[in-house]
């Protein structure tokens, strides 16, 4: 069943609130119509009958390296996020060809989101993480090229801690996102819930953003390990796939939503995957060998 326009507009207002909290300074978020949000609120409250104009705005992003600015133009169709968002990035430091490539990459990334997922914040993060290469490639066109260097990628492993992971729909989402992004690792359900995700940096960061967005509060990345690699990173992986890890519940409470996972079993699992060192990082206690 398709979502109603009113439901879509409510989600748009929610995302705009998040954007204004992310960019609180005057002029960072510039609405094409300063009354746009007010008109939508009136429409949702029933004091305005006509469908309000679409939300259109520009966000000015400061890219740290190189020191440049990107203006991200955004148009939210009335049925967004259930239909595609309209995005376009501009910068005076990019020529026409590089600007085209930048927007092609951005559009391709946004196309990976499912209908109903808000994605402006993710688009901003993508630009902040990935735009530098487009400016660099423009610079190389005008500068004498030196001996080509192998392209390096960052291989990342994130250790994520949650108070608990019980709900079936959340567990399914975690597995689906992990397999879609071709990362490896595991999700240990129960209390506490532990997730390990490893792969290229951009894939892991997208995984992290997607699973906790929009309202998973009791979750944090406790530890991250990264290394530069010129290969595909396969030799750096500690896991061969992304799977759900089901361990015995301490005290055998069955399916009750208050059971604690058997941390002794979890420690043995970590040892098998050369990750015993993260036990103390995750739980604040030193691991003890079962042989002692």
UniProtKB/Swiss-Prot annotation:
Gene3D superfamilies named in the record: Ubiquitin Conjugating Enzyme
Organism: Macaca fascicularis (Crab-eating macaque)
Transmembrane segments: none
UniProt name for this protein: RWD domain-containing protein 2A
InterPro entries: Phi-like, Prp3_C, RWD_dom, UBQ-conjugating_enzyme/RWD
Pfam family, one: Prp3_C
Highest taxon above the source species: Eukaryota
Residue intervals of the RWD domain: 14-134
